[in-house]
Amino acid sequence: MEDQQQKKYQLMTETPVSRLIPRMALPCVVSMLVTAFYNMADTFFVGMLKSNAATGAVGVVFSLMAIIQAIGFFFGQGSGNFISREIGHKNYQEASEMASTGFFSALATGVLICVLGLLFLEPLAYLLGSTDTILPYTKAYLSVILLGAPWMTSSLVLNNQLRFQGSAAYAMVGITSGAVLNIGLDPLLIFVLNLGIAGAAWATIISQFVSFCLLLIGCTKGGNLKLHLSHVKLKPYYYLWIFKGGLPSLARQGLASVATICLNQAARTYGDAAIAAMGVVQRIMMFGGSAMIGFGQGFQPVCGFNYGAGLYHRVKEGFWFSVKVTFVLLLAVSAAGFACAPQLVSIFRDDPEVIAIGTAALRFQCVTFCLQSWVVMGNMCQQTMGLTVPATFMAVARQGLFFIPTVWILALTLGLPGIQMAQMVADLLTFLCSVPIQIWVLKKLSQPQK
């Protein structure tokens, strides 16, 4: 065990970052692409039901799934950042205690979300942005998704902890296996067993449970930290570090959910087609950015290990390398998305009104999409270094500080076109805000070590 950990330490602190980050990133990129693909699978197969209300319901419930994911990322990123730095310090005892504390805390929180959500199902559906016509579909989909909340939150913790230990391959196997299963189960449950939109939800939670089991097995392999209930330490010290490391993710994911709710509320004025179109565009853009997020996840353990070991020059090298690669990637994705916008939207809902609304929104977002390379890599760098204040500020900037007020202001002044262009405006403002903050972080890394 100790020999495996020492070899992993040498790998993370001595291999050139231009070789190490792609090696760490490849499983993460595959995981993110497959995850984004199966997130779109529900939208695709539900779209085949030929109902704008059903397609809209998937978009409405997506905001709650984002909240559940936010909880998972809070505990996963919070514990994972701590783990990577402590392994960098060769402090394996505290790293092991943090792993168990983060995992079981997320599991308990998922159970709480499940119980409360089922108790207040209909009010929750309206809060998420459901209309009266969408409500029956929303309740059918939402009630099943809530049942999977415990393992949805805890599997994200396992995924993040494995990545931060440099074991992204185990994380990839767990995530991709569940994703492939989901894609197979969707048509079976929706059409063959005639479960409709509820079948899509069952496919999602069954596949995520399989992922959870495989990720749990991965924690016992390759010198990774093992999870034990006896290792859970309900100490303020550990929860403070979870809070510091996970708050940016909670803020980012949580506000993404709030932003989706605001978007649905603004779009509902223009009918089910508008809600369906904006939901489809969200899924497309998520898929477009998934490779960038995956590459950044490959950068994070490299950042954490080397920051913990005091090798600040490697942290800076890794940041610049990641920004360059992801900028080129997003530029290519943006060009393809802009050129093929009508065709992409029509894959999920072949309705003229949905296609028209979605095409304009997708093209607006493609204009500024490549700027996310600097914003996201910078935010991941800040978060992994434990710089809670700038990391949290930048995490809330895009969807909270800028998007939420922008979508309401533009909706009131420009109507539907304002809703369609709101994300583009928010992305530009976020980039302008992030430049001086990340420059300050890079200067901090250039200062003499104390």
Residue ranges and their predicted role:
Residues 1-25, 83-150, 192-247, 303-368, ...:
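Short alpha-helical transmembrane segments in multi-pass integral membrane proteins
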Residues 12-44, 48-49, 63-78, 82, ...:
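N-terminal transmembrane alpha-helices
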Residues 23-42, 144, 178, 207-211, ...:
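Transmembrane helical elements of multi-pass membrane transporters/channels
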Residues 33, 37-55, 125-132, 188-195, ...:
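Helix-terminus/linker motif at the lipid-water interface of multi-pass membrane proteins
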Residues 43, 52-55, 92, 121, ...:
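Membrane-helix interface/capping residues of multi-pass secondary transporters
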Residues 55-115, 152-171, 277-341, 372-394:
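Small-residue-rich hydrophobic transmembrane alpha-helices
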Residues 67, 182-186, 212-216, 287-290, ...:
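Hydrophobic transmembrane alpha-helices of multi-pass small-molecule transporters
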Residues 76, 145-163, 171-179, 200-213, ...:
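Short runs within selected transmembrane alpha-helices of multi-pass transporters and secretion channels
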